[in-house]
UniProtKB/Swiss-Prot annotation:
Record's keyword annotation contains Protein biosynthesis: no
PANTHER family: ADENOSYLCOBINAMIDE-GDP RIBAZOLETRANSFERASE
Function: Joins adenosylcobinamide-GDP and alpha-ribazole to generate adenosylcobalamin (Ado-cobalamin). Also synthesizes adenosylcobalamin 5'-phosphate from adenosylcobinamide-GDP and alpha-ribazole 5'-phosphate.
Protein name from the UniProt record: Adenosylcobinamide-GDP ribazoletransferase
Pathway membership, UniProt: Cofactor biosynthesis; adenosylcobalamin biosynthesis; adenosylcobalamin from cob(II)yrinate a,c-diamide: step 7/7
Length: 262
């Protein structure tokens, strides 16, 4: 394979990842199959970078003319519109299942139900409120820091969530599941590029902030793995969405705490 063909393949994979995790349409010339979708997992972090960057741009463009809370809300709306609430939906389904089921089978069945339950509604409300409040505090501290935090959090949270595909068991047998093509374990190339995208984006932070966030994300990933294994024995597409949302919130929390003590 020539260098040009290799670059074309990588661009194809990024566009597949973008089309899967956002509402941004893929070019018509991009062909999608299960193998491509699995390999595209290497670029999930870069998709987060794109979503975070666009959300940050909306915030930066509006924060001089609008109250911080409104600018933050507009940035959050931008993120939801770009992704179609993909991860938020997974968060709600996960909390409905984990909160309402006794056995792993019950939890998986409840998570499959498209209706929103009380546990999912509470989780969505609390996460969105907490995300808004943390970002408002960051915006009042420094608008540049707040926008940078959006970029970092959207990227790193997706890296952590997608890394679960590499180590954990996919527990749905339903062939119609949208996440089924992702369920094959990632190769070393996929994992390396995925982690590299997360590490590189940390370079926008100060040394202590980057190190603190890295250590917290490593610990949080381990905690998420333990919980998912105990609850359902592995992961589903919904739990990956929940992991992304939780990691994003924790990113903002860490950056706010570190920023306040520097």
């Amino acid at each position: 394979m020539s260098e040009r063909e290799s670059w074309h393949k990588e661009i194809d994979l990024f566009l597949v990842a973008m089309g899967y995790f956002t509402r941004i349409p893929m070019p018509k010339w991009v062909e999608v199959d299960a193998d491509k979708l699995n390999k595209a997992s290497r670029y999930f972090g870069l998709v987060g970078l794109l979503v975070g960057l666009l959300s940050a741009i909306v915030f930066w463009l509006t924060q001089n003319w609008l109250p911080a809370g409104v600018s933050v809300l507009l940035s959050m709306v931008t993120g939801v519109l770009l992704t179609g609430g993909f991860h938020e939906d997974g968060l709600a389904d996960t909390f409905d299942g984990f909160g309402g089921g006794w056995t792993a089978e019950d939890k998986l069945r409840i998570m499959k139900d498209s209706r929103l339950g009380s546990y999912g509604a509470l989780a969505l409300m609390l996460v969105l409120m907490l995300k808004w409040q943390l970002l408002v505090e960051l915006a009042l501290y420094d608008p540049v820091v707040a926008g940078s935090a959006m970029i970092v959090a959207h990227t790193v949270s997706r890296v952590v969530a997608a890394s679960l595909i590499f180590t954990e068991k996919y527990v749905r047998d339903d062939e119609s599941s949208k996440s089924k093509p992702l369920a094959q374990h990632q190769g070393i190339n996929e994992l390396f590029i995925l982690i590299a995208s997360g590490v590189l984006v940390l370079l926008v932070l100060k040394g202590i902030a980057a190190l603190s966030l890295l250590l917290v994300m490593i610990g949080l990933r381990r905690l998420i793995v333990v919980i998912f294994r105990r609850q359902i024995g592995g992961y589903t597409g919904d739990t990956l969405g929940a992991a992304q949302q939780i990691c994003e919130i924790v990113c903002y929390f860490v950056l706010l705490v570190v920023g306040s003590i520097l």
